């Protein structure tokens, strides 16, 4: 009875426009129904048996075993086998910054939660600190240190998240400055190019395939093209880089707090 009622509620919630958008993405009504049902019921935590360790699942090869494994891999590549580094890169960074989005919209102006306090206490350590500081100077006329001294923490958060600044709230995670080095920071995408050159190249060529979301494809292509030559020259390899889009049929519906489908202003 409850299941039939749930199906009835789903049916009356979906408009003709909803059904059209769902069909265009290759998603069935039953899939949407199942997604909303799971959102309503919640996602149970997995019950862990124990922490992973060398006694439970983690391998700890000896130095001799490591050397043998490396030799076997190098021999495999030397035989002319094609190696492709596959990188799922369609994830958006919005979830990474959900706490900072909440702070930007909060009814208080200074860091209050433990997360907010830690974020600003360690902001100097982030790989994107220099770029963020430059955006703050450009948009606010002050650097990060001065903004913090003046209590303008939200200005820093907004310059990190919004399009006027770094736009990190909307970028794919692969294009965020992720690691800091003495000479310069690198995005996650750049690190994959480096890794491909170091351990996945064969006969002087490194093959890399990125999967990205449709909306990020042009920017991702541009950023890859911008960095490809630099790392090809640095590591002495020729890159063969391809990109594909994640299928819309893998999308999950967004829901409001009352479990009704979330819609933009245009429906």
PLM feature spans:
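Short, Lys/Arg-enriched N-terminal segments with co-localized hydrophobic residues
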Residues: 1-12
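N-terminal regions that are enriched for targeting/export leaders
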Residues: 14-54
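Domain-scale recognition of functional cores that engage charged ligands
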Residues: 22, 44-267
